[in-house]
Amino acid sequence: MPIERTKVVARTGRGGLSLIEEALPPLGPHDVLIDVHRSLVSPGTELGGGWAALRRERDDPKPLEMPRPIGYSNAGVVRSVGADVSKVSVGQRVAAVGAGYARHAVEAVVPENLVIPLPDAVTFEAGSFAMLAATALHAVRRTRVSLGEYSAVLGLGLVGQLTAALLRLSGTYVIGWDLLATRCRTAERMGIDATCAVSDADPVEATERFTGGAGLDNAVVAIAGEATSA
């Protein structure tokens, strides 16, 4: 029997979150219906800027625009596919991305071009990181790093941690900056070369010591804010 409704996490117009039930969109010829096993909370979007938005909504509710489903990265098993889908099949493990599609939901309808097969060795939990991992990978590619260079990652949230790990795998020496010492310690456990908790130390001096005075070859800004808005 076809599934017609699902449950999804949504922002409400009162500055909060709620689990709501809504109709699933019809399955188009290029769509994939996924039974979601894991979805990833993006701290910068949903807990950073997201909480600011929640406060605005609490102070100025807009009932006609709420509730608003959230989430953009999940993983699960394909339940059904549209007539023209060729990349994945029913029963296959997949990861999905895309705001408005790969939501925090029980089921999700996602366009085929936003769905990728998951290797057997990759867990659903790891697969749900696909969107943020792709963001980090794009940042590393844009730096055009070379072996032996010095890199800095400014901000050690999820994207920053993933970026630092990928830079290390690319053969660079990496220092990470963050306001929170706990994030620096996490990066150190992940194998980063050096960190600086900028609330306790001067990051410029720390970076000069790290590079032996040579300076940085590249840097990735992995923090939310107007300076990083495209």
Where are these regions (language model features)?
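Short, compositionally biased
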Residues: 106-120, 171-172
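A structural motif shared across PLP-dependent enzymes of the aminotransferase-like
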Residues: 43, 98-112
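Glycine/Thr-rich phosphate-binding loops of Rossmann-like dinucleotide-binding domains
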Residues: 104, 161-162, 228-230
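Glycine-rich beta-strand-centered segment in the early N-terminal region that forms part
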Residues: 25-41, 49, 53-100
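Conserved hydrophobic beta-strands of the Rossmann-like cofactor-binding core
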Residues: 94, 150-153, 219-220
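Residue-level marker of beta-strand positions
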Residues: 38, 73, 92-93, 107, ...
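Mid-domain Rossmann-like dinucleotide-binding core that forms the NAD(H)/NADP(H) cofactor-binding site
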Residues: 125-200, 205
